[in-house]
Swiss-Prot record:
Residues modified by glycosylation: 230
GO terms of molecular function: UDP-galactose transmembrane transporter activity; UDP-glucose transmembrane transporter activity
Name by which UniProt lists this protein: UDP-galactose transporter homolog 1
Organism: Mycosarcoma maydis
GO BP: UDP-galactose transmembrane transport; UDP-glucose transmembrane transport into endoplasmic reticulum
Topology within the bilayer: Multi-pass membrane protein
Amino acid sequence: MTLLQLGVCAGSIYTTFLIWGLLQERLTKTPYTAPATLLHPNPQPDYFRSPLFLNTVQALFSSVVACMYLLVRNRGSNKRVTQILGLHTLTPDGIAEKTQNGRASATNGKAAPTRSRWISPLLSRYILIAALQSTASQLGFLSLRYISYPTLTLAKSCKLVPVLVMNVVLYRRKFASYKYAVVGLVTLGIWLFMAFAPSKPGKKAKAPESSSLIGLVLCLLNLVLDGATNSTQDQVFSMFGRQTVSAGQMMLVMNAISAFLMALTLTLPIPLLSTPGQPTQLSTAIAFTQKHPEVWRDIIAYALAGAVGQVSIFETLERFGSLTLVSITVTRKLFTMLLSVVVYKHELSKLQWLGVAVVFAGIGIEAREKRREGLANKVIHDEKRALAKDA
């Protein structure tokens, strides 16, 4: 059952984020052209340059979808709406009561979270996660001003390493030895696949100087914050337990906080985020949507696809942890490109095929160990049931 659940989660992530990726490319790379008028018979194509606005709408949609998901999943339940949505645990008294009833400290082998007079320890971690994620996404977009998209993608392929490092450094977590092997194999394989892609005919190779030091520093900070985000999410599930916080509840609250933080940033005249003639990203986005109202169709579809995909992401995070989740997300690019090879008859270099083999070796180890863990848990469960019957 564990392996089947992992397959369902991975398949859902691949499907939804394949659609999400196509819409993201359309929004960021495809020009929008306004209808010709007497005053402007030959309108110039425009590009949507408000990534912070996109992320804000994405977070709002994700909050709504998470709320609907929780309510539908718990329909017929006797719980109050605040309990279903996990809102009652966001107060100091609520988290103390829930932790005590759920016996989080006994379940996870850790001391119960320290009770604060002013803020729930769970809410403080939600705020931290939202701030880390919001900042990381903006650093990624800013890095594209200085480095090429392939360079950023290549760096993102090594995301497993900072996630593993942050889990160990920040929260002193220990992993089974096979996890380190899987991280190494998948990272190496993805790097080989991305680094040795043959250059497309008719396109000149970019000089190494295009990847400036500023862009690489921003990219590195993006990876570090991504690793801190995933490891902190892991720590929340480990510290408070699934009886206290569920994947849907984390998705709801985290995205609501992210939407608030990013909406606030949208209204601030930050030089790095503004464009010529517009003091804020909000004014930039509003001006663009007024000129090209058809962009709303792509924005809404993009946000909806991302929100549905996040449900699968948070379920995977809750059930299997951040390392397995990031293994799925970083290999999504590889499977997408392999699909492109099959459909459009693209060619891969020998080193790329080696990278594919290395990644599949890592995935095979992960699947084998997950199956062993599932069988071991089944044996333990059967033994407990047998002992209960004898008693």
